[in-house]
């Protein structure tokens, strides 16, 4: 696949530095790439420089955390002005919120007999490349494995860090509506990340998409890495029903993970592709 609109670097919870990630994407045949780190724009300049040297198109990207219906939701933004005041302010708030969240996760783990989690997760993060951002849940998970509290990252998420568990701290995120508004005001195209990852009933997922459209969302991510084909089919049906654009990406975090950069299931051919719009500036008032 020569377009990948979802991947992560060491600027957030990925394992590869932005320039290394871009080089890997190029080797895998990707020619249009968006780096979508969690709640930070920190890796974009390095990624853009690397992409330009290889003749690739680097689309500004970010994956913002927000809340809806008591759950943490992720929203992808593309093609925005990196210096737009609304986005810069939102990123600063999220940066602070992520540190508060990491401190809270560490406190909770300490009460369960796992002291030193923040320092340990930070050490894991710094081994990959220090970003100055708070360690994320994968860093905590890797620390738990290293300390022998769990056997692997999957167990860490299943028992301690996943949705609804002790480490699922979300009160530091803005609302879905505010997040979409921030992205729109910054000139972004907006896509709802991996709608099937949320543990929702069918009716709640439909309500999420309806509210997301009401907030001004443009697209949904119908393909996320190697997610099951039946999920892609169900999301495609929703995209058709709601008249949405669609995006797709590997959600690559690092070598040896569940996905590879530039690899994901095919997008159903009849769906309108978000990346087909990137040549045109979104008209914020009317799109």
Model-based region annotation:
Residues 1-9, 15-30, 42-83, 94, ...:
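Charged catalytic cores and adjacent phosphate/nucleic-acid-binding surfaces used
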Residues 34:
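A short beta-strand/loop micro-motif in the catalytic core of glycosyltransferases
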Residues 81, 92-103, 134:
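Short, amphipathic alpha-helical segments
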Residues 88-97, 127-130, 166-167:
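Flexible, glycine/proline-enriched loop segments at strand-loop-helix junctions
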Residues 96-128:
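Conserved phosphoryl-transfer catalytic core
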Residues 130-195:
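Conserved acidic, metal-coordinating active-site core of Asp-based
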């Amino acid at each position: 696949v020569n377009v990948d609109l979802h991947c992560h670097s060491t600027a957030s919870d990925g394992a590869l530095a932005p320039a290394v990630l871009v080089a890997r994407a190029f080797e895998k045949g990707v020619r249009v790439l968006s780096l979508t780190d969690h709640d930070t724009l920190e890796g974009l300049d390095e990624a853009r420089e690397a992409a330009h040297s290889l003749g690739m198109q680097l689309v500004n990207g970010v994956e913002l955390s927000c809340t809806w219906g008591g759950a943490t939701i992720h929203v992808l933004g593309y093609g925005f002005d990196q210096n737009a005041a609304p986005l810069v302010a939102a990123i600063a708030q999220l940066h602070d919120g992520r540190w508060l969240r990491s401190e809270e996760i560490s406190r909770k783990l300490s009460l369960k007999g796992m002291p030193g989690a923040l320092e340990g997760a930070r050490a894991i993060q710094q081994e990959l490349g220090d970003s100055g951002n708070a360690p994320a849940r994968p860093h905590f998970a890797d620390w738990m494995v290293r300390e022998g509290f769990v056997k692997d990252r999957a167990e860490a998420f299943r028992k301690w860090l996943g949705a609804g568990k002790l480490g699922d701290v979300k009160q530091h995120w803005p609302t879905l509506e505010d997040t979409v508004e921030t992205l729109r005001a910054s000139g972004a195209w907006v896509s709802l990340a991996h709608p099937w990852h949320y543990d929702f009933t069918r009716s709640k997922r439909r309500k999420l998409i309806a509210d997301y459209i009401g907030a001004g969302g443009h697209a949904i991510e119908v393909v996320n890495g190697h997610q099951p084909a039946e999920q892609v089919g169900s999301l495609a049906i929703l995209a058709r029903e709601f008249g949405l654009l669609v995006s797709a990406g590997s959600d690559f975090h690092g070598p040896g993970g569940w996905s590879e950069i530039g690899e994901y299931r095919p997008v159903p051919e009849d769906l309108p592709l978000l990346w087909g719009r990137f040549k045109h500036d979104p008209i914020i008032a009317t799109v």
